[in-house]
Each structure stands twice: as C-alpha cells, then as structure tokens.
C-alpha cells in the first residue's frame, strides 16, 4: 500500500496528524483520507478499463506501466521484444564487422614481439631496401672498414636521401573549386 514509505515514515505521519488534527478529529480525518484514496483508485481503474475497451482486443495485454518512457526503453533495449519489423532488425555481415561481434585479437606489443633491428622491420614493405644500402658507393677506405659494430649499425639505420634533380620542379596545380 505504501510503496517507498517505511514504517518510520508512517509513524512520523501519524504523530504529525495527531498534533495537527488532535486526538478527537484524527479518526475522522483518517477515514476521510482512506475514502479519498479508495475513490482515486477506483477512478484510475475505471479509466484503465475504458482505455483497454477502446483500444480493442489486440491491446488487451497492454500494461499502462510499459508506457512510461524509461520502462519502454529499458524493455526494448534489454529484452528480445522487437519494436521494429524483423526485416529492419536483421543483421548483415557489414553490421557484424561494424559492431564487432567477433573482433580480431589485437596484436600484443611486447619486447619479444617487436623486431630488434629497426632497419629490418618489414622486407615486403616498399622502400625497405632503400633504407639500408647494401654497400657504400665508391671505394672503401681502410679507415671505414674497421668501424665498430655499434657505429656501423647506426650508419645503416640512417635512411638514404632521395636523389635531387636539377630540372624544373613540377608543382601540383591548385584547384579552388575542389576545396
């Protein structure tokens, strides 16, 4: 009867009623309050029955509490009660890719999975051969042949500069309509 009202609150309300109405008028006020509540319930039940009879038999199982926006959304999001027609709820392979039903496992980035030599990352990648020259052009001086391995690997990791041509530079034309 008292949804959300505990016994402590009921006792406080009775004490307030006792002080406001006094011990002589409190029983009559309680009877009047009970009568008003009973009439309100009958009025609400009558309106609910009239609504169900007006809507017809297809809405006989309609629950008025389901019409509250929060319960409506909660019911249709968390239960398998479709609001949309079945052809609109059918999932396609594109939906499964976008929503990620079976997401691919992300590669783990640990020290053991990373390549040790930064120059030898991916030989299939275009331009990987140009990053590490096989042999320096021209004659090799005896001083360079005895370079320490750490300096040699540092020299190998420096990418080769692209050759510059002295010809006229071709600029990309600017199209003001395209932007």
Swiss-Prot record:
Transmembrane segments: 2-22
Recorded superkingdom: Bacteria
Topology in the lipid bilayer: Single-pass membrane protein
Keywords: Cell membrane, Membrane, Protein transport, Translocation, Transmembrane, Transmembrane helix, Transport
Primary location class: membrane
Stretches the record annotates as Disordered: 98-179
Subcellular location: Cell membrane
Signal peptide: none
Disulfide bonds: none
GO biological process terms, semicolon-separated: protein transport by the Tat complex
UniProt keyword Transport, yes or no: yes
Biased composition (Low complexity): 98-109
GO molecular function terms listed in the Swiss-Prot or TrEMBL record: protein transmembrane transporter activity
Family: Belongs to the TatB family.
Subunit structure of this chain's protein: The Tat system comprises two distinct complexes: a TatABC complex, containing multiple copies of TatA, TatB and TatC subunits, and a separate TatA complex, containing only TatA subunits. Substrates initially bind to the TatABC complex, which probably triggers association of the separate TatA complex to form the active translocon.
Function: Part of the twin-arginine translocation (Tat) system that transports large folded proteins containing a characteristic twin-arginine motif in their signal peptide across membranes. Together with TatC, TatB is part of a receptor directly interacting with Tat signal peptides. TatB may form an oligomeric binding site that transiently accommodates folded Tat precursor proteins before their translocation.
Protein name: Sec-independent protein translocase protein TatB
Lineage start: Bacteria, Bacillati, Actinomycetota, Actinomycetes, Frankiales
UniProt gene name: tatB
């Amino acid at each position: 009867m008292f949804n959300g009202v505990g016994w402590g609150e009921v006792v406080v309300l009775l004490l307030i009623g006792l002080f406001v109405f006094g011990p002589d008028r409190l029983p009559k006020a309680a009877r009047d309050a009970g009568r008003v509540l009973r009439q309100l319930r009958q009025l609400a039940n009558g309106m609910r029955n009239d609504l169900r009879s007006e809507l017809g038999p297809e809405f006989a199982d309609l629950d008025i509490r389901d019409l509250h926006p929060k319960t409506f959304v909660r019911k249709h999001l968390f239960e398998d009660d479709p609001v949309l027609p079945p052809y609109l709820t059918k999932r396609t392979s594109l939906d499964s890719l976008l929503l990620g039903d079976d997401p691919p496992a992300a590669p783990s980035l640990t020290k053991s999975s990373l390549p040790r030599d930064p120059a030898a990352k991916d030989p299939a990648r275009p331009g990987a051969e140009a990053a590490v020259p096989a042999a320096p052009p021209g004659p090799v001086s005896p001083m360079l042949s005895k370079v320490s391995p750490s300096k040699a690997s540092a020299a190998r990791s420096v990418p080769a500069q692209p050759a510059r041509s002295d010809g006229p530079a071709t600029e990309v034309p600017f199209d003001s309509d395209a932007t």
